[in-house]
From Swiss-Prot:
Its EC number is 3.1.26.3. This is Ribonuclease 3. SMART domains: DSRM, RIBOc. Mg(2+) binds at E75, D148, E151. One of its GO terms (cellular component) is cytoplasm. Residues 1-22 are annotated as: Disordered. Digests double-stranded RNA. Involved in the processing of primary rRNA transcript to yield the immediate precursors to the large and small rRNAs (23S and 16S). Processes some mRNAs, and tRNAs when they are encoded in the rRNA operon. Processes pre-crRNA and tracrRNA of type II CRISPR loci if present in the organism. Residues 31-162 form the RNase III domain. It comes from Chlorobaculum tepidum (strain ATCC 49652 / DSM 12025 / NBRC 103806 / TLS). The keyword Membrane does not apply. Belongs to the ribonuclease III family.
Length: 272
């Protein structure tokens, strides 16, 4: 296959940078002070202003010469930097986790709701640059606008301070706010995952049934089966019923994710 989009020479188009010194729009003193506390001393102040510029400014009247740039491009870059650095952190912290668990945990950290919460704590909404005709108060508290601003800020830090600077910011203001152990516990709560799976597919809730209960009171063994829509999904065996249910749900999730089970939307013939 011919990859025609690849450059024939690595130097073509390289080294293009924006000239912050020629910028007509810089940061106001309060925002500059706030960003310095969060990121260290900015070198390219224009790029941080762009990171905080909401797309609503594009609807204002500007001459072509002085037309501002919104934070959407920086948001794209920051999203990739966040994914990379959060992925690396989880990869190192949890050497026993497989790709699926790592991806799931990363998604919990970098989803829009989480990013907006981080941005709110960093008071980014108060420093957003918003179009004159836009609803400023609504945008300053908007989940989407806050998440976009955080991603754009990460992109700006990356361009201004490099990967090391972006990593410092993410470590101090994102990772430090996440209880990774609770995150992993939630990931390994297979009963919760199974409920989420059935709810997302408009299926009946999972049903757990004790198949056998053997042994004396202090040394019992439970065998629990979980089913959905009359179809058995998995079994678990453990000294505690709660643990047996988790193991049954774990087997069910493994089979569901591997496509080992049929269509759960069709009730089992025995229940028809």
């Amino acid at each position: 296959m011919s990859l025609q989009f690849l450059r024939s020479e690595a130097s073509d188009g390289a080294g293009e940078t924006s000239d912050a010194s020629s910028a007509d729009f810089l940061l106001d003193p309060q925002t500059a002070t706030h960003l310095a506390r969060l990121t260290g001393r900015p070198c390219n102040r224009l790029i941080y202003r762009t990171a905080l510029t909401h797309r609503s400014v594009l609807h204002d009247h500007h001459s072509e010469e002085h037309k501002p740039e919104s934070n959407q491009r920086l948001e794209f870059l920051g999203d990739a930097v966040l994914d990379l650095l959060i992925s690396e952190h989880l990869f190192k912290q949890f050497p026993g986790s497989d790709e699926g668990h790592l991806s799931s945990n990363r998604a919990k950290i970098v989803n829009r709701k989480s990013l907006a919460a981080f941005a709110l704590e960093l008071q980014l909404g108060e420093h957003l640059i918003i179009g004159e005709s836009a609803d400023k108060q609504k945008i300053r508290t908007s989940e989407s606008a806050l998440a976009d601003a955080l991603e754009a800020l990460v992109g700006a830090i990356y361009l201004d301070q490099g990967l090391a600077g972006a990593e410092r910011f993410i470590t101090n203001h994102v990772i430090a706010k996440v209880d990774l152990h609770k995150l992993v516990e939630a990931e390994y709560n297979y009963k919760s995952r199974l409920i989420e799976y059935t709810q997302s597919r408009q299926l009946p809730p999972p049903l757990y049934t004790v198949i056998t209960e053997e042994g004396a009171e202090h040394e019992k063994t439970f065998v629990v089966e979980v089913s959905c829509n009359g179809q058995p999904l998995g079994r678990g065996t453990a000294p505690r019923k709660k643990d047996a249910e988790q193991l049954a749900a774990k087997e069910a999730m493994k089979r569901l994710e591997s496509g080992d089970l049929g269509n759960l939307n069709e009730p089992s013939p025995q229940n028809s």
